[in-house]
Swiss-Prot record:
EC primary class: transferase
Keywords: Acyltransferase, Cytoplasm, Iron, Metal-binding, Transferase, tRNA processing
Cofactor, how bound (note): Binds 1 Fe(2+) ion per subunit.
Function: Required for the formation of a threonylcarbamoyl group on adenosine at position 37 (t(6)A37) in tRNAs that read codons beginning with adenine. Is involved in the transfer of the threonylcarbamoyl moiety of threonylcarbamoyl-AMP (TC-AMP) to the N6 group of A37, together with TsaE and TsaB. TsaD likely plays a direct catalytic role in this reaction.
Protein name (Swiss-Prot/TrEMBL): tRNA N6-adenosine threonylcarbamoyltransferase
NCBIfam families: gcp_kae1, T6A_TsaD_YgjD
Gene (name only): tsaD
Reaction catalysis annotation: L-threonylcarbamoyladenylate + adenosine(37) in tRNA = N(6)-L-threonylcarbamoyladenosine(37) in tRNA + AMP + H(+)
SUPFAM superfamilies recorded: Actin-like ATPase domain
Entry-linked InterPro entries: ATPase_NBD (IPR043129), Gcp-like_dom (IPR000905), KAE1/TsaD (IPR017861), TsaD (IPR022450)
Family: Belongs to the KAE1 / TsaD family.
GO-annotated cellular components: cytoplasm
Alphabetical list of HAMAP family matching this protein: TsaD
Length: 341
C-alpha cells in the first residue's frame, strides 16, 4: 500500500511517501528552528502560520522526490495528536482535504506511536519490548505488545527530559535549540565535576521528574557563575547531562528487567543525544538487553514514522473518515480501543 503521511504536531512541517509501511520513497521536513530561535522556544501561533506556508511545498516535494503523483496514493495518515492545537489543525485539515478530493481512506496516528514505530523503518524488533519515548514534550515508558497495544509503565511527573534540557540551556544563555548545544559542550566537559541530583532514581517506580534537577542547576549557577563558553560551562553541561541520562537509562533498563523483556527501544528527539545513546548502549549490553535506537533523522519529528502504524491500520480497514479531528491530548494506551472496535 502506498500512503502519504503528514506531520505538523509542533514546529516541523513534514510529509513522506512510504510503501507497505516500511519502504520510504521520500521524507521531507521543513524546520522552523530559525523562526523560533529569537524567542528561545516554540511560539504556537508562529508555528501554525509557518505550517500553513510550508505544507503545500513540503507535500509537493515529497511526491516529486518519490516520483509519484497523488493518483498513485492509496491512503493518507496524519498526526492527529498529541501536540499544539493550531499546528495539528493545519495537518489534519490538509490531510482530510486530500482524502476527500481523492476519495482515499484516512487514519489519524498518535505522534508518540509514530516515534515508537520509527525503528521499523530501519530494522525489525520482536514484540514485546519496552520503549522509552523521550522528547521535549514527553518522557514515558511503555510496554509494547504490538502496533496499537501499549501499556504505560511510567511517565514524568513534571518536566519532560527534553524540556529540562532546553530550560537549562536557556538559563545558561545557550542558543536554541538548547539540547543540541548542551550535547555539543558536554562532549568537552567533565561529567563528574559537579554532583547533581538524580530525581526518583531509587523510588521503586518507573516515573520521572526533572524539575528538581533543573532547579539544582539554577541554584548552582547562582552561586557559581560560569564564563561564557569556558571550561566551567562545559563541565556544567556534562554534569547535568550525565545526571539526566543516568535516570533515563536506569529506569528504562529496570523496567525491561521487571517486565521480563529483553528488548528496549528508545525514540523521540532526545534519543538524538550522543551521551544517552552511548550510555544506554553500554548498560544494555552489560545486562544482555537488546537495544534499538533509530538513526537521528528518524528520532526527530518526521512524517515517515507515521507510515508504520498508518499502513498497519489502513491495511486492516481501520480508518477515521472526514470526522477526524485534532487531539491535543491523546494518551497512547487508549489506542487499544481502535483494535477492539
Amino acid at each position: 500500500m502506498l500512503i502519504l503521511t503528514i506531520e505538523t504536531s509542533c514546529d516541523e512541517t513534514a510529509a513522506a511517501v512510504v510503501r507497505d509501511g516500511r519502504t520510504v520513497l521520500s521524507s521531507i521536513v521543513a524546520t522552523q528552528v530559525k523562526d523560533h530561535a529569537v524567542y528561545g522556544g516554540v511560539v504556537p501561533e508562529i508555528a501554525s502560520r509557518k505550517h500553513l506556508e510550508s505544507i503545500p511545498v513540503v507535500i509537493d516535494e515529497a511526491l516529486r522526490t518519490a516520483s509519484v503523483s497523488l493518483d498513485a496514493i492509496e491512503g493518507v495518515a496524519v498526526t492527529q495528536g498529541p501536540g499544539l492545537a493550531g499546528a495539528l489543525l493545519v495537518g489534519t485539515a490538509v490531510a482530510k482535504a486530500i482524502a476527500f478530493a481523492r476519495r482515499l481512506p484516512i487514519v489519524g496516528v498518535n505522534h508518540i506511536e509514530g516515534h515508537l514505530s520509527a525503528i521499523f523503518l530501519e530494522r525489525e524488533v520482536a514484540f514485546p519490548f519496552v520503549a522509552l519515548a523521550v522528547s521535549g514534550g514527553h518522557t514515558h515508558l511503555y510496554r509494547v505488545d504490538g502496533i496499537g497495544r501499549y501499556t504505560t509503565l511510567g511517565q514524568t511527573r513534571d518536566d519532560a527530559a527534553g524540556e529540562a534540557f532546553d530550560k537549562v540551556a536557556k538559563l545558561l544563555g545557550l542558543p536554541y535549540p538548547g539540547g543540541v548545544e548542551i550535547d555539543r559542550l558536554a562532549a568537552e566537559g567533565d561529567p563528574a565535576s559537579i554532583s547533581f541530583p538524580r530525581p526518583l532514581l531509587h523510588d521503586g517506580s518507573f516515573n520521572f521528574s526533572f524539575s528538581g534537577l533543573k532547579t539544582a542547576v539554577l541554584n548552582h549557577v547562582r552561586k557559581n557563575p560560569v564564563q561564557e563558553d569556558g571550561q566551567q560551562l562545559r563541565d556544567l553541561c556534562a554534569s547535568f547531562q550525565r545526571a539526566a541520562c543516568d535516570v533515563l537509562v536506569t529506569k528504562t533498563l529496570l523496567a525491561a528487567e521487571t517486565e521480563g523483556i529483553g528488548r528496549v527501544v528508545v525514540a523521540g528527539g532526545v534519543a538524538c543525544n550522543s551521551a544517552l545513546r552511548r550510555d544506554m548502549a553500554r548498560e544494555a549490553a552489560d545486562r544482555g538487553i537488546e537495544l534499538a535506537i533509530p538513526s537521528p533523522s528518524l528520532c526527530s519529528d518526521n512524517a515517515a514514522m507515521l507510515a508504520v502504524p498508518g499502513d498497519f491500520y489502513l491495511s486492516r480497514g481501520i480508518s477515521d473518515g472526514l470526522s477526524l479531528d485534532a487531539l491535543v491530548n491523546w494518551p497512547l494506551d487508549t489506542i487499544r480501543t481502535r483494535l477492539e472496535s
